[in-house]
Amino acid sequence: MPLFPALKGRGNKQSLAKAETNEMRKADAPSVGRYEILDEYNIIPQTVSVEISWNPNTMEAMYVVNEPVMSSEELDLLKRITKNMEQIVKNTKNFPDDLSTVTIDKVIDAYLKGRKYKLNRRTTDKIRYYVKRNYEGFGPLEPVVRDPLVEDVSCNGVGVPVFVEHKIHGSLKTNIVFDSEKELDSYVVRLAQMCGKEVSMNEPIIDGTFPQGHRIQLTYGNEIATKGSAFTFRLFRETPFTPIELIKYGTATSELVAYLWLMVENLKSAIIAGVPGVGKTSTINAVLMFLPSNTKVFSIEETREINILHQNWVATSTRESIYSSASRDEKNPPIGMFELVKMAMRQRPTYIVLGEIRGRESYSLFQAISTGHTAYSTIHADSMETLVNRLESNPLNIPRVLISGLNVVIFNKFVRVGSRNLRKLMEVDEIVGTDTDSGEILYNKVFSYDFSQNRQKFSGYSKILNEIRDTKQMTQEEFDSEFQRRIELLEHLVTNNITDYTNITRIINIYYKDPETALKMASGK
């Protein structure tokens, strides 16, 4: 729970974030009579909810945050509490000298008790919500940050609606707007401070990471961004996207997910490719849920995004130098992806996971694959041809002989279905070698998206599945039965809405030892 000292100096800088105009915000939200509600769910039960509404006039969907509406009396009380937070602590004898144990709830209780307020529970809950939202949370964006289905949040300037990237509904405009330069500048300064950094006109561009793991890039003032201060942050989720959610949301079929399961279990290396924002990180987190518990994993990232429930896992991230290039202390050098990949190879992990392929460390990763390591990573590419060109070009410079050691490439793409852009695993390709005459990379399309059926279809041939069958010395009938059993387990998990990653990981690891018991658990028997 956040501690009271962390609140120092924030109260006056962060406005009530339009709590006083909540009625106006609510009025801006679509009404059921004029708009179609596509989706609705709670963020905080009985306090904050979200609606995804379709506007037939503008032909666009909107992300609507519904927060508690404050009466004038409640608003007045809220202002008094937020204005006097630190004074409340100083005037309360029951608080210990060590303020590290003092929480916001205790401060609010002390204020209400000292003034003999008798509030109903609903009013008290509202007060607690707004004080916490503005002091230890993300202010007006707190509901959005809490939403497990939101991946990215961006504000493009004053008077412009905040946009979110939703896992199911794609890019959506919200009903959250910063109305003045002063309000937005103050909010951006606070975001920078939450990352432990300072932003100013002298240093108007900041990249940072919040304590929760969320990654932000922001600009201050209007010298860089003409509409005023702006920011974009990528949300890190403590609860990772699961393979069951890939199936549940129509991103992949159970047949395709069963293929990925066998791929991971049998040490086949893969890259997840696609344009920015298409869900590559969600896919790699889902795929890594199939890692057997008796294996060692080493992950390498610039910013933490990989999240797996695995005990034998070394999770590393790069370190920036705290000095400028002109005054860098050689005793505190930056530690980059290249150094971490070399370190990973020395530790002999079963799996190496590289957050993204984009620099000289990629050559070392492909060398690791060629020497027998299993590796997973992501890359910006939308086709096999684009992928090969990127890998061969500067700054990667990976020769085709190393590229051919990769086993599988999974392409994430956006597909237009009705009015929505949905994420799909569009294509799964297996690299089978290089052409002896032309030197071209040869690959086989194992799964491809069928637009008429809105699903991925198996081509009927997989080199990898055949290799796994032969390695395990199974007949085709035995292998088909095993493949079907995994599909059955996955579909049971979907049917029974078992999407919690801890339960899924547990059932998968039980399957490796006792398939029938795992099937019973998945089916609820």
Residue positions per predicted region:
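N-terminal accessory targeting/assembly segments
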Residues: 1-195, 199
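P-loop NTP-binding catalytic core
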Residues: 155-269, 311
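Conserved P-loop NTPase
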Residues: 408-494
